[in-house]
Amino acid sequence: HMCVGSTVGPNIFVKICGWSTAQISKELKIQLKKEFKTIPNKVKLINCVGGGSSAYGFWSEFIDYDKKQIELIGVEAGGPKKSKLHAAPLSKGAKLGILHGAAAYCCQDNEGQIKETESISAGLDYPSVSPIHCFLKDTKRARYTYATDEAALNAYKMVTKFEKLNPSLEPSHAFAEAIRIAPKLSKDTILIINSCGDAIKDRDILKGRLGKY
């Protein structure tokens, strides 16, 4: 038996995990209609992507919408600025490979062996990604990018300063992308970021890097 905590691996595990996390987007849809009376015309849903379970759950109810109305943006772990290692197979040109019983984009060496990854976020430090996200990338339904460790830390500092949130380092990657693109957007664009984890699990890392938690 396998115990899988993300939308990775053989199809049945992807289905089970995807079914359970889809509740996130069901709730979001209700909240949007309550806030705006309808689904707004310009929405960007930004989520971090490691294995990809929270991103799929966040997007599930919106995948069939036109991407001009609902844009799906996944943010992978770009690793430290000065390192060549990362955990961003979708946004850094990884090739198709086999890992944990599934075909997906994987960080590999020239011989097809799985490469070492590096990220400040343990939750994003995975050398592959859900086959669902590979499909969304290939069909251009979702856009994938990455944030470096430094960008994620800066985003964490900004969010905790101005919002009543204490996000873990995983969603801090998503916040980093939101901060990067926000100044370029029209005023009627709705940005929604899934703050999918609490920083209490990263407190030792944050103390080491920022001197406080």
Short names for language-model regions:
Residues 1-12, 16, 36, 64-69, ...:
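Active-site/ligand-binding loops adjacent to catalytic centers
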Residues 16-23, 193-213:
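Glycine/aspartate-rich loop-and-adjacent alpha/beta segment that forms the canonical ThDP
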Residues 48-59, 82-84, 171-178, 200-203:
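Short glycine/serine/threonine-rich phosphate/pyrophosphate-binding segments
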Residues 29-39:
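Phosphate/pyrophosphate-binding loops at sites that engage ATP/ADP/AMP, CoA/4′-phosphopantetheine
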Residues 41-55, 72, 189-195:
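A short, small-residue-rich loop immediately preceding and capping a beta-strand
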Residues 160-194:
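C-terminal structured "cap/appendage" subdomains that terminate the fold
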